[in-house]
Design a protein with these regions (language model features):
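N-terminal, active-site-proximal structural segment of metallo-dependent hydrolase catalytic domains
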Residues: 3-132, 140, 144-147
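Structured beta-strand-rich core segments of catalytic domains in phosphoester-bond hydrolases
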Residues: 117-199, 203-205
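Extracytoplasmic/secreted cell-surface and envelope-processing proteins
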Residues: 78-79, 121-125, 150-151, 209-212, ...
Length: 314
């Protein structure tokens, strides 16, 4: 059974999460960057294998703050993108696309993480609108799974020097969608002009449309798959600052989010930031059905980024 409900993202709160994430300075030794290009860096189709060689990351002095803005773009579909599923989609009105671009402009962010992007043409459309507003974010990553119309995207002012994104992430026990995460994992590393690196991961877990509990179960399974991926990522790069963001479709106390955070008091633990708006509110979505407010969009950082400065700047 499907639940019919009206919902809207908090435009005054964290329809976008904004965080000053460059509270520490970072550099990398023996790093081989990709060619500095504004073109999209292709994502892998499958999850990485085990046994990756440990990379050692050096930590230089602090640098200037870097601002990250994340947002669920709300079905950013444009006619130029091919349809990847049998579901009917509605193209996003020009006014709504302009509103997304304006939110990004107002944030002043150098890096933007997006979910529910309709494809390559949708990303180009947003970049074009940003450029008209004087915002240059030429570097990008797009993750689109076959059979899914909504994808993950990252736009950056700075070069993307590594892309380990996974389109088809295996999910244990999932009987649908060939046992993969619905929207994959965006995993890209951005390098600032002073040499610091930030590994950014974007996700969008299964929606909350089903009343029978299947959606919740799917999110939990996706969460375990993501947690396994995070464990490998943290173990394989010693000293890399890592930030996870996205639309989790679950609150802080829900099991999926708890699984993703990982075990307490270990290097694998992710710390959840709590950005607040000018009124001190933290909710990110409102459901008219039930008149309820929820925090489903989250931002997590690893121990390297979790300092008092990070908490103050969020």
């Amino acid at each position: 059974m499907m639940r019919k409900t009206s919902k809207r993202r908090g435009t005054s709160v964290i329809a976008a999460l904004v965080v000053l994430c460059a509270v520490l300075g970072y550099g990398l030794t023996e790093w081989k960057p990709l060619t500095d290009t504004p073109q999209a860096v292709p994502a892998s189709r499958a999850a990485p294998g085990k046994g990756r060689v440990l990379e050692k990351i050096s930590i230089p002095e602090k640098g200037e703050p870097v601002r990250l803005f994340t947002i669920n773009a709300g079905n950013y579909f444009v006619p130029e993108d091919p349809r990847r599923s049998n579901f009917q989609v509605k193209y996003k009105p020009v006014e709504a696309r302009e509103a997304v671009a304006e939110l990004i402009r107002q944030s002043g962010a150098e890096i933007v993480g997006l979910s529910e992007m309709g494809g390559e043409a949708a990303v180009r459309d947003l970049q074009m609108r940003l450029k008209r507003k004087g915002v240059q974010l030429p570097h990008k990553v797009l993750v689109m799974r076959n059979g899914e119309d909504r994808g993950l995207a990252l736009l950056s002012k700075y070069p993307i020097v590594d892309n380990r994104s996974v389109t088809d992430m295996p999910v244990s026990g999932e009987t649908k969608r060939k046992k993969t995460m619905l929207r994959g994992i965006l995993d890209a590393t951005v390098k600032t002009p002073d040499g610091r690196l930030f590994r950014l991961m974007g996700i969008h877990l299964k929606s909350r449309l089903s009343r029978d509990g299947s959606a919740e179960d799917t999110r939990r399974r996706e969460a375990y798959a993501l947690r396994d991926y995070l464990n490998e990522a943290i173990a394989s790069q010693d000293g890399m600052p890592l930030l996870l963001y996205g639309d989790f479709n679950d609150g802080p106390a829900d099991s999926a989010v708890q699984v993703i955070q990982g075990p307490a008091k270990t290097e694998y633990r992710l710390n959840r930031l709590k950005p607040r708006d000018s009124r001190g509110e933290t909710w990110t979505i409102y459901y008219e059905d039930g008149d309820t407010y929820h925090s489903f969009d989250h931002l997590f950082i690893n121990c390297l980024l979790y300092t008092s400065d990070a908490a103050d700047d969020s």
